[in-house]
């Protein structure tokens, strides 16, 4: 789980409860849980759930384990930009998804995305986030990128050159411009998450919003450099 939290902090990433897997709902504030202390990242709150707290089901012997990440809106104080629920893949995670669906929050405070972890296929829209994933040792999860010409990472270039080779391992698909991504390529890529940088008053993400793929809004470019790493 530590790497998931670091990745979330680093890019506000969220490989990140809501009622439907990979879907979106309105959300209330974070529920009770174990809040991780952030030394520098003031716009990010991460709460661990499980370990015998109220989410456990003693009758069924289930200890529902998941993490909740709340990203504060950097442009409007006191509001939330996005909420992410990270649920491990597998049978236990499936039960957690079902449990959270029954307990769905009705407060309309921010968009919520459920992310099954670990994320193994992602589309990364900007170079700094690609570099971050390499530094974290998560580079194999990069399966698509935008603005390839501006990504000066030799391994990304090499893997992108293999995208047409069906026998190649972990190729990277060129998804076009981050301002006008190739939706068909992204659909074919089947990413488990899309990592991008949000902007004030962007008006949403157009067709990307309709793909039902978790969009990880990483506004780390406006933070103090230390806050990008927790």
Segments from the language model and where they lie:
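Bacterial N-terminal signal peptides that target proteins for export
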Residues: 1-9
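C-terminal motif of bacterial Sec signal peptides marking the signal peptidase cleavage site
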Residues: 16-19
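Bacterial signal peptide processing site
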Residues: 21-24
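Short Lys/Arg-enriched alpha/beta "domain-start" segment
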Residues: 26-40
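Short edge beta-strands and adjacent beta->alpha junctions
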Residues: 50-58
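Short, hydrophobic/aromatic-rich segments at coil-to-beta transitions
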Residues: 61-68
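A short, structured surface patch at a secondary-structure boundary
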Residues: 68, 73-200
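Extracytoplasmic substrate-binding proteins
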Residues: 184, 188, 192-230
């Amino acid at each position: 789980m530590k790497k998931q939290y670091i990745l979330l902090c680093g890019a506000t990433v969220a490989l990140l409860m809501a009622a439907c897997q990979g879907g979106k709902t309105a959300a209330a504030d974070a529920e009770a849980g174990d809040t991780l202390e952030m030394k520098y990242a003031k716009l990010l709150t991460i709460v661990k759930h499980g370990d015998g707290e109220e989410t456990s089901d003693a009758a069924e012997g289930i200890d529902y384990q998941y993490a909740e990440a709340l990203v504060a809106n950097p442009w409007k104080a006191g509001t939330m930009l996005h909420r992410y629920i990270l649920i491990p893949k597998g049978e236990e995670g499936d039960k957690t998804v079902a449990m959270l669906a029954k307990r769905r929050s009705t407060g309309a405070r921010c968009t919520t995305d459920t992310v099954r972890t670990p994320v193994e296929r992602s589309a990364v829209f900007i170079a700094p986030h690609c570099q971050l994933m390499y530094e974290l040792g998560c580079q194999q999860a990069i399966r698509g990128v935008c603005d390839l010409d501006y990504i000066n990472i030799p391994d990304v270039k090499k893997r992108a050159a293999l995208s047409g080779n069906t026998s190649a391992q972990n190729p990277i698909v060129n998804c076009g411009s981050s301002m006008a991504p190739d939706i068909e390529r992204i659909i074919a890529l089947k990413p488990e998450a899309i990592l991008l940088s949000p902007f004030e008053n962007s008006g949403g993400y157009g067709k990307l919003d309709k793909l039902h793929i978790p969009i990880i809004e990483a506004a780390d470019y406006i933070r103090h450099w230390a806050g990008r790493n927790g």
